[in-house]
């Protein structure tokens, strides 16, 4: 379990929004994997079992747009394209969730013919993981090491090891995000991604990634605007209405 901390640092409420913004389509093109070169069906298939969400029957969109939606499948496209274009060999994720990002990474490594994935989560649903064995190729699973525990426990027990790409998607409260960054900042060789960066003006309970990211210096940082920018957005949001995304960090 994550350690319960006292009051959040006063820094947790401070965010600047001073960050370069890039649309996911532009970033994928820069990586040599423009949207038109990717099979959206592959990501949709992975998401069907690991990421698709159901709306509350009480919500307006349930009646106007439908019961199910695809939340930010584009994150898998980014991870896949980074691995393929940069020929990365190792991937660590803090926070497995239901496995969407993990299996998008596995698909990329499988196509490259090599690679390793370590995924860390204190709340793995082992039955869910086993059920996916009948859905996804077995060689994907051979690349994945499932570690049940907190990120602190993982780093405490591990012999120091570096990873080409690290994805931080654990507890989004300030102190935990900061601890994940402190644990990971010397461990990524090429890239690190933070999930759920919110620009000033977007407020959501326990979403405090931005305050940590805005205080990070000496790295290149890009906010990738992505949620339903490639896949259909049945909310009808314009690009300007998407005031959140994922932050890609790489060394200068």
Model-identified regions with their sequence ranges:
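S-adenosylmethionine/decaboxylated-SAM
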Residues: 62-70, 74-252
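Rossmann-like AdoMet
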Residues: 1-70
């Amino acid at each position: 379990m994550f350690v319960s901390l006292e009051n959040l640092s006063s820094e947790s409420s401070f965010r600047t929004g001073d960050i370069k913004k890039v649309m996911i389509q532009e970033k994928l093109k820069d990586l040599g994997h423009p949207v038109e070169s990717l099979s959206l069906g592959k990501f949709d298939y992975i998401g069907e079992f690991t990421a698709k969400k159901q709306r509350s029957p009480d919500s307006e969109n349930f009646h106007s747009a439908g019961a199910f939606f695809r939340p930010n499948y584009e994150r898998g496209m980014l991870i896949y394209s980074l691995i393929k274009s940069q020929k990365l060999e190792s991937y660590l994720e803090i926070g497995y969730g239901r496995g969407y990002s993990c299996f998008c990474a596995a698909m990329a490594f499988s196509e490259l013919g090599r690679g390793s994935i370590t995924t860390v989560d204190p709340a793995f649903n082992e039955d869910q993981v086993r059920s996916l064995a009948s859905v996804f190729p077995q060689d994907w699973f051979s690349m994945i090491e499932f570690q049940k525990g907190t990120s602190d426990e993982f780093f405490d027990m591990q012999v120091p090891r570096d990873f080409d790409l690290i994805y931080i998607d654990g507890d989004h409260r300030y102190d935990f995000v900061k601890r994940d960054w402190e644990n990971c900042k010397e461990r990524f060789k090429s890239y690190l991604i933070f999930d759920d960066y919110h620009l000033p003006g977007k407020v959501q309970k326990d979403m405090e990634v931005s305050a940590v990211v805005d205080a990070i210096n000496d790295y290149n940082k890009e906010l990738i605007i992505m949620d339903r920018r490639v896949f259909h957005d049945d909310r009808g949001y314009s690009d300007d209405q998407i005031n959140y995304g994922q932050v890609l960090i790489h060394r200068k």
